[in-house]
């Protein structure tokens, strides 16, 4: 930690997304080349400055309520995200990071029942996002092209479109075959 800032990152610095993307690409390529490869030493990549800054940027853009500690994104912005990220980095590096309990809220459902909702602290969301940034490319390498659930740049609408197109092809092939036989 340097001057209350994330190591190597001035508080006003632009997010070095290119460095994070390079890391992700490298992890993806390694995972794709060998399905049996075991990855070691990923933990130190989670607390890299560029990864934490990108995780913060994504958490900030998602917004959301404060967790059990009542610390909001706005309060962190006022205090300075550099100091906030430096604290996270130091805790992760020293092995002292422990996630906080999740704040539980209930939201009403259309049928009158309630659905439980867990709200993690902003701090925990940043660590979760940093972990996702590092591990996602490794898992992505193993997913099938036909898999759409909870994947980057894929949606339920795209899955439905693939099903619709495949269904049309099957229907046309069946119709053509049926006509040819009669």
Q: What is the role of each PLM region?
A:
Residues 1-8, 13-175, 179-182:
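Conserved pre-catalytic core of RNA-dependent polymerases
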């Amino acid at each position: 930690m340097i001057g209350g800032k994330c190591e190597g990152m001035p508080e006003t610095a632009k997010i070095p997304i290119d460095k994070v993307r390079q890391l992700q690409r490298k992890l993806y390529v390694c995972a794709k080349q060998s399905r049996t490869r075991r990855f070691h030493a990923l933990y130190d990549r989670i607390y890299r400055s560029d990864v934490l800054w990108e995780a913060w940027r994504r958490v900030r853009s998602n917004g959301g309520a404060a967790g059990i500690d009542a610390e909001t994104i706005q309060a962190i912005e006022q205090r300075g995200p550099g100091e906030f990220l430096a604290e996270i980095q130091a805790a992760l590096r020293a092995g002292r990071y422990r996630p906080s309990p999740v704040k539980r809220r209930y939201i009403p459902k259309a049928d009158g029942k309630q659905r439980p909702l867990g709200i993690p602290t902003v701090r925990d969301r940043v660590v979760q996002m940093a972990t996702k940034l590092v591990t996602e490319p490794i898992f992505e390498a193993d997913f099938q092209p036909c898999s759409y659930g909870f994947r980057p740049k894929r949606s339920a609408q795209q899955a439905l479109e693939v099903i619709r197109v495949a269904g049309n092809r099957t229907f046309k092939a069946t119709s053509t075959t049926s006509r040819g036989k009669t």
